[in-house]
Amino acid sequence: DCAKEGEVCSWGKKCCDLDNFYCPMEFIPHCKKYKPYVPVTTNCAKEGEVCGWGSKCCHGLDCPLAFIPYCEKYRGRND
């Protein structure tokens, strides 16, 4: 059993299309579509773009600890 776009993932349920979707680290995560990787020109990576590897996330976004991390919105923090 696997989760499609917008369906709840984790809890032992992975996204069906792992090449194009990821399961964000959230309390109740839903499968999200990767945004295609584009070189960061603004010196920061936007939501869904690859971070780490020398590129930091733009303000208000977090770079999760993952093999290929993608910027995601901060949770539980307001800054």
From Swiss-Prot:
The presence of 'disulfide through disulfide knots' structurally defines this protein as a knottin. This toxin contains 2 'disulfide through disulfide knots' that are separated by a short linker. Bivalence accounts for irreversible toxin action. GO terms for molecular function: ion channel regulator activity; lipid binding; toxin activity. Keywords: Disulfide bond, Ion channel impairing toxin, Knottin, Lipid-binding, Repeat, Secreted, Toxin. It comes from Cyriopagopus schmidti. It is found in: Secreted. Domain repeats lie at residues 2-31, 42-71. The lineage of its organism: Eukaryota, Metazoa, Ecdysozoa, Arthropoda, Chelicerata. One of its GO terms (cellular component) is extracellular region. Disulfide bonds join 2-16, 9-23, 15-31, 44-58, 51-63, 57-71. It comes from the Eukaryota. Interacts with TRPV1 (2 toxins (4 moieties) bind 1 channel (homotetramer)). The keyword Repeat applies. Selectively activates the heat-activated TRPV1 channel. It binds to TRPV1 in an open state-dependent manner, trapping it there to produce irreversible currents. It binds to the outer edge of the external pore of TRPV1 in a counterclockwise configuration, using a limited protein-protein interface and inserting hydrophobic residues into the bilayer. It also partitions naturally into membranes, with the two lobes exhibiting opposing energetics for membrane partitioning (K1) and channel activation (K2). This is Tau-theraphotoxin-Hs1a. The record marks 25, 65 as: Important residue for activation of TRPV1. Belongs to the neurotoxin 23 family. Double-knot toxin subfamily. Expressed by the venom gland. Its main location: secreted. Residues 2-71 are annotated as: 2 X approximate repeats with cysteine pattern C-C-CC-C-C. The keyword Secreted applies. The record marks 11, 27, 53, 67 as: Interacts with TRPV1 (reaches into the void formed by S4, S6 and pore-helix).
